[in-house]
Curated annotation (Swiss-Prot):
Signal peptide: 1-20
Protein name: Seripauperin-6
Protein's UniProt keywords contain Signal: yes
InterPro entries per UniProt: SRP1_TIP1, Yeast_SRP1/TIP1_CWP
Organism: Saccharomyces cerevisiae (strain ATCC 204508 / S288c) (Baker's yeast)
Keyword terms: Signal
Top-level taxon in the UniProt lineage: Eukaryota
Name of the gene this protein is made from: PAU6
Family, as annotated: Belongs to the SRP1/TIP1 family. Seripauperin subfamily.
GO MF, one annotated term: structural constituent of cell wall
Pfam family, one: SRP1_TIP1
Record flagged with keyword Oxidoreductase: no
Biological classification of the source: Eukaryota, Fungi, Dikarya, Ascomycota, Saccharomycotina
GO cellular component term, pick one: fungal-type vacuole
């Protein structure tokens, strides 16, 4: 007969090796912060491309928080809280390289953080 403590220890060991995951709505602020973190990093890495896009599309504006985060090389995540989810979606999907560069990077970052999204 197997002792209950042995079963509990086995379950605890399995649970410790499994990655913790969280399922969140796409509009959840934690999802938005991951998306914005990837977005800011992409702007930093491809600044000239974003400047050219901005020049060609002057009505596509960025919240001041995003601009400050791009040029502040410290911890910028607290600057990005409070940006509306629809504005986050508009910014990140509004550039031509969204599906080739941003979407895969966002998916990877969310997965790395154990976050999976569901449609709102």
């Amino acid at each position: 007969m197997v002792k209950l403590t042995s079963i509990a220890a086995g379950v605890a060991a399995i649970a410790a090796t499994a990655s913790a995951t969280t399922t969140l709505a796409q509009s959840d602020e934690r999802v938005n912060l991951v998306e914005l973190g990837v977005y800011v990093s992409d702007i930093r890495a491809h600044l000239a491309q974003y400047y050219m896009f901005q020049a060609a599309h002057p009505t596509e504006t960025y919240p001041v928080e995003v601009a400050e985060a791009v040029f502040n090389y410290g911890d910028f995540t607290t600057m990005l809280t409070g940006i509306a989810p629809d504005q986050v979606t508009r910014m990140i999907t509004g550039v031509p390289w969204y599906s080739t560069r941003l979407k895969p990077a966002i998916s990877k970052a969310l997965s790395k953080d154990g976050i999976y999204t569901i449609a709102n």
